[in-house]
Amino acid sequence: MVPPITSDEFCETSGCFGDSANLHTTLERLKININSDAKKLVDTNGDLKKHQRFLRIAKVTSLRSKDPNTQVGCVIVDKDNCIVSVGYNGFPIGVDDDVFRWDKEDPEDNKHLYVVHAEMNAIINKRCTTLHDCTVYVTLFPCNKCAQMLIQSRVKKVYFLENRDELAFRASKKMLDHARLPYEQIVMPQEAYVIEL
């Protein structure tokens, strides 16, 4: 059984992102609390436990999104298994949720025109100079635009939870395959999403 996320991990991940200073402070705390025991994450299941742990953090991060339909979280980890960035889908800084709605019906107010995706936010808010050789953990397989950014950032691999059979995701797979950027879906048991408060 995968151990539940502790209240400390939840608070560290869910209460941040008010501004970039808050993000950097929280990432520093995450690095200490989450990554100090990174070596313990590898067990008889190989790296599976480590991947599940970072995907759980991505899942908790997704709870920060105000999107009523699709909450996505992303965690980027360096070669030492230290978190260098997190992101979730939402409107750009300074864009009011009350003015810009999460609508998909009206073409001019369609949320897809305005929302910054979790992967994009994580890339923009990184705490390092480069993402070269970093690993990405995301709750939803990256769309074609996010795949472009991940390829350009030269990340090493993408792990994801959920996949969709839609044009943007098929195009993404085609690009990732051609760029030889590996991706892998991790199936997690339901109890892996339990959060202890």
UniProtKB/Swiss-Prot annotation:
It catalyses: dCMP + H2O + H(+) = dUMP + NH4(+). Zn(2+) binds at H117, C143, C146. Its cofactor is Zn(2+). InterPro entries: APOBEC/CMP_deaminase_Zn-bd (IPR016192), CMP_dCMP_dom (IPR002125), Cytidine_deaminase-like (IPR016193), dCMP_deaminase-rel (IPR015517), Deoxycytidylate_deaminase_dom (IPR035105). One of its GO terms (molecular function) is dCMP deaminase activity. Keywords: Hydrolase, Metal-binding, Nucleotide biosynthesis, Zinc. GO terms for biological process: cytidine deamination; dTMP biosynthetic process; dUMP biosynthetic process. It holds the Pfam family dCMP_cyt_deam_1. Residues 49-183 form the CMP/dCMP-type deaminase domain. The keyword Hydrolase applies. GO terms for cellular component: cytoplasm. The active site is at E119 (proton donor). Gene3D superfamilies: Cytidine Deaminase, domain 2. Its EC number is 3.5.4.12. Belongs to the cytidine and deoxycytidylate deaminase family. Supplies the nucleotide substrate for thymidylate synthetase. This is Probable deoxycytidylate deaminase. It comes from Caenorhabditis elegans. The lineage of its organism: Eukaryota, Metazoa, Ecdysozoa, Nematoda, Chromadorea.
